A protein has these predicted regions:
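S/T-rich, low-complexity, solvent-exposed segments of bacterial secretion/appendage proteins
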Residues: 1-561
Length: 561
């Protein structure tokens, strides 16, 4: 047997034990012992599980690394080309060729953003399918292990000897199962194998086996997760970090650590570019003498209700908070409501709960509004205790990134409004239909926050609510809006001083390039999270994926070396 089975997978060398026959007729075979060490096998299976996870992770992350590192097909050269076309426009603001060049580079850039998101989304869907395939193979293996436990017990009872062939099959199955997932093996009295998940939930217990299922995540219908079906037939979703070893663990870990993060970073980059550019474009005037509109469109945030919510309340609207896009982060969020009806908002990337000052919740008796991290959600009622929601602000934003302009005359290269003064403000923006009255406005802010507006009687809002300059005062952080022009006051004047701001419709002509220059300057502005330029953010993402790829390869080489 030892010679004929030398290449048989799972075969263990056998040792024949001889003894004197009872009839003094020479020797007889007393036993055939299988040479198998459970401790060595356990260590080998653990190493196999770890190596399999790393190999799977390395195979997946290398695809993203190759995508991002391609200097010709990457986003960096296309963003550079887009801003270079703005430089050409600034040099000849009324030239049709310069305007057509800008639209062409914008279309090419947005198409590449969509292609990147599509590639990453295909990987998400591919992982969903691979998880389902792995679960099928795992269930087949655990069912066979339970069957072998029964057959081995029966064989021992019949002959009183170890059925070596069946034992080899069982240990080979455990080794193959270890390639797919990390597991816990316990040998009970009677030599039966019990297999359980790392969290202790049984998969094989004697002659019984329990099934895993690839199920739709209860918090995200686009995501496949592991479900555990107990003896009562109840299906419960497992935490995504339950399995960390084997092919299955490699897929789950890669998705959580790298794929989700990269897709969110691409989305954050797209939203930051679109929001910043649209804001500046609305401050411009086109060749028809009209205010500029949104140059780009972008996908809005996604929000999902947990399937076990009991309050019957859904998120009816999810949108970006244009005044607070510097708070936008490349992460998903989990919202959970407490007994008092207040939300608790947690970042999914690091598990940090947002402080009370980082979100705002308001329920008016009919509709709830929650703002945090650069997004605003509208609820159609008051969620009850335990209700949960999954929010993906930027995950699929790039999938719907498009250029809105096809008419060359609609490019707002000239300046729509003029502004000057020493008032400390930021986020100056023109909403649709701004300055329709044609008035020029003069504002004066005192150290105590009192605001004088000329002409008097002009409608003013503060943080979205009516503001009366006669009785109300301004504090740092307030957002004011007058005739469609909005801005945030960042600081009050020093003691004994006042600050002023004047704005109105600018005089513009076909040769005006002031807004084209302002849009070009966005290339170096800190548009991403208020801390990084577009090129810096993209370079950081490429570097992060590259570093992760190298770490995985080094660890894999160490395991296989």
């Amino acid at each position: 047997n030892n010679i004929s089975n030398v290449y048989t997978p799972g075969y263990n060398r056998e040792l024949t034990i001889l003894g004197q026959s009872r009839a003094d007729a020479g020797v007889q075979v007393n036993d055939i012992q299988r040479q198998f060490n459970h401790y060595v096998a356990s260590q080998l299976n653990a190493a196999t599980s770890s190596s399999s996870a790393l190999k799977t992770y390395e195979n997946q992350i290398s695809q993203i690394d190759n995508l991002l590192a391609d200097r010709e097909a990457g986003l960096a050269p296309l963003m550079q080309s887009f801003f270079s076309s703005l430089e050409d426009l600034a040099g000849a603001p009324s030239d049709p060729a310069a305007r057509q060049g800008l639209l062409g580079s914008a279309d090419t850039m947005t198409a590449q953003f969509r292609a990147f998101d599509g590639y990453l989304q295909d990987m998400q869907e591919g992982i969903n399918g691979q998880i389902a395939d792995e679960v099928t193979q795992i269930n087949n293996a655990t069912e066979q292990l339970a069957t072998l436990n029964r057959e081995i017990a029966l064989a021992r009872a019949r002959s009183g000897k170890a059925p070596n062939s069946l034992l080899n099959q069982r240990d080979q199955l455990v080794a193959e199962l270890s390639e797919r997932m990390n597991l816990r093996l316990e040998i009970q009295d009677g030599k039966s194998y019990n297999i359980s998940l790392p969290n202790g939930q049984p998969l094989v217990s004697g002659t019984n086996h329990y099934r895993l299922e690839a199920m739709e995540s209860p918090s995200d219908p686009q995501r496949t997760v592991l479900g555990y079906k107990d003896s009562g037939g109840n299906l419960v979703a497992l935490s995504e970090d339950t399995i960390t070893g084997g092919t299955l663990g490699g897929l789950m870990t890669f998705r959580a650590e790298t794929l989700d993060k990269t897709q969110n970073q691409i989305g954050q980059l797209a939203v930051s570019l679109v929001a910043g550019f649209n804001q500046q474009h609305r401050l411009g005037m086109d060749l028809n003498g009209d205010q500029g509109g949104d140059f780009f469109s972008i996908g809005q945030p996604k929000a999902y209700s947990h399937e076990r919510n009991t309050g019957g309340v859904d998120v009816t609207s999810a949108s970006f908070d244009s005044a607070n896009l510097d708070q936008l982060r490349a992460t998903d969020y989990t919202i959970r409501f407490d007994a008092a009806g207040d939300p608790q908002v947690t970042r999914n990337d690091n598990g940090r709960a947002l402080t009370a000052g980082e979100f705002a919740w308001d329920f008016d008796g009919t509709v709830g509004e929650l703002s945090f991290g650069g997004v605003t959600l509208i609820f159609d009622g008051q969620p009850v205790e335990g209700d949960r929601y999954q929010v993906q602000p930027v995950r699929r934003a790039a999938a719907e990134m498009n250029s809105n302009i096809s008419d060359l005359d609609k490019i707002a290269a000239g300046s729509f409004m003029r502004s000057e003064g020493d008032m400390a403000i930021r986020n100056l923006r023109a909403n649709d239909g701004a300055l329709t009255t044609g008035s020029a406005y003069s504002l004066e802010l005192a150290e105590n926050g009192s605001l004088t507006v000329v002409p008097g009687g002009s409608p003013v809002t503060r943080n979205g609510e009516a503001f009366d300059p006669v009785t109300d005062t301004v504090v740092a952080g307030d957002t004011l809006e007058i005739d469609g022009i909005a801005f945030e006051v960042t600081a009050l004047p020093n003691a004994g001083e006042t600050a002023s701001l004047e704005f109105g419709v600018a005089s513009s002509g076909t040769g005006d390039n002031r807004n084209a220059l302002a849009m070009q300057n966005l290339q170096d502005a800190s548009l991403v999270a208020g801390r990084a330029s577009l090129s810096q953010a993209y370079a950081g993402m490429v570097s992060d994926v590259g570093n992760r790829t190298n770490i995985v390869k080094v660890n894999l080489d160490a395991r296989q070396g």
